[in-house]
Amino acid sequence: MTSQRTRERLIQRLCEEGVSNPKVLDAIRRTPRHLFVDEALAHRAYEDTALPIGHNQTISQPFMVAHMSELLLEAGPLDKVLEIGTGSGYQTAILAQLVERVFSVERIKVLQDRAKERLVELNLRNVVFRWGDGCDGWQALAPYNGIIVTAVAPEVPQALLDQLAPGGRMVIPVGPAGEVQQLMLIVREEQGFSRRVLGAVRFVPLLNGPVA
């Protein structure tokens, strides 16, 4: 289940699906995904599929985690990334190995607490967590040169656009909850924002308000 051979099969699959950034692949290879799912699902941890983590949330499929991370890093190294939707902490753990600092916002307290414990166990200490409404971002620590959103919004929240630094990149799924959505790459340029649609995806909805 957790053997190196099992993880290498996942890496091979990601490469076949088009992931090519060696740093992203190494981070996926090093990260024990089975620690981020319930024990009953641990035997499926290295399948390239999303899995439930409770509270109507999921851990994203490894390909999507790798793809979004790769898009974020496409223009070069990042030192300050905002993650909206900590969830299990798996995407957080990948980012923590790729960028200097991660600031992660989660609205469901129990999920955030579990994610914190997992990252401490993995000795990933360059992450700061906030329990709150992800739609608001984290204005107090803005701007960010990367923003990654792990839940779908009907439209891009203005607060997140405002918190993106000049030249910064945001990867976000946009569209109606429960239907086919579009993954978008947004770049803050001198004259405004450029937007590139990257393909169809399906994510859980980005909801308002923290939950204890």
UniProtKB/Swiss-Prot annotation:
Active-site positions on this chain: S60
Enzyme Commission (EC) number: 2.1.1.77
Keywords associated with the record: Cytoplasm, Methyltransferase, S-adenosyl-L-methionine, Transferase
Matches recorded under InterPro entries: PCMT, SAM-dependent_MTases_sf
Keyword Methyltransferase: yes
Top EC category: transferase
Catalytic activity reported: [protein]-L-isoaspartate + S-adenosyl-L-methionine = [protein]-L-isoaspartate alpha-methyl ester + S-adenosyl-L-homocysteine
CC terms in the record's Gene Ontology section: cytoplasm
PROSITE patterns according to UniProt: PCMT
GO terms under biological process: methylation; protein modification process; protein repair
Gene Ontology molecular functions: protein-L-isoaspartate (D-aspartate) O-methyltransferase activity
Domain of life: Bacteria
Compartments, as annotated in UniProt: Cytoplasm
The protein's role, per its UniProt record: Catalyzes the methyl esterification of L-isoaspartyl residues in peptides and proteins that result from spontaneous decomposition of normal L-aspartyl and L-asparaginyl residues. It plays a role in the repair and/or degradation of damaged proteins.
Family designation: Belongs to the methyltransferase superfamily. L-isoaspartyl/D-aspartyl protein methyltransferase family.
Protein's name in the database: Protein-L-isoaspartate O-methyltransferase
Source species of the chain: Pseudomonas putida (strain W619)
Gene label: pcm
